[in-house]
Curated annotation (Swiss-Prot):
Belongs to the frog skin active peptide (FSAP) family. Brevinin subfamily. Transmembrane segments: none annotated. It comes from the Eukaryota. It is found in: Secreted. This is Brevinin-2GHb. One of its GO terms (biological process) is defense response to bacterium. Disulfide bonds join 66-72.
């Protein structure tokens, strides 16, 4: 029984230390502005995809207009 208590206490201690280290690392990432960089990358990618989608949509509309009016 005593060895089981020691094992559980050791497991609890190691889990607490691990959690503490994760929180410190997360705090360091927030201080460095890591999230801002990720948001900026997402914004750039999103803008590029929107631009490409608009270009493709405009081209499809132009072709559809051409075929519907028989002015090709």
């Amino acid at each position: 029984m005593f060895t089981m208590k020691k094992s559980l206490l050791l497991l609890f201690f190691l889990g607490t230390v691990s959690l503490s280290l994760c929180e410190q690392e997360r705090g360091a990432d927030e201080d460095d502005g890591g999230e801002m960089t990720e948001e900026l990358k997402r914004g750039v990618i999103t803008d590029a995809l929107k631009g490409a989608a608009k270009t493709v949509a405009a081209e499809l509309l132009r072709k559809a207009h051409c075929k519907l009016t028989n002015s090709c």
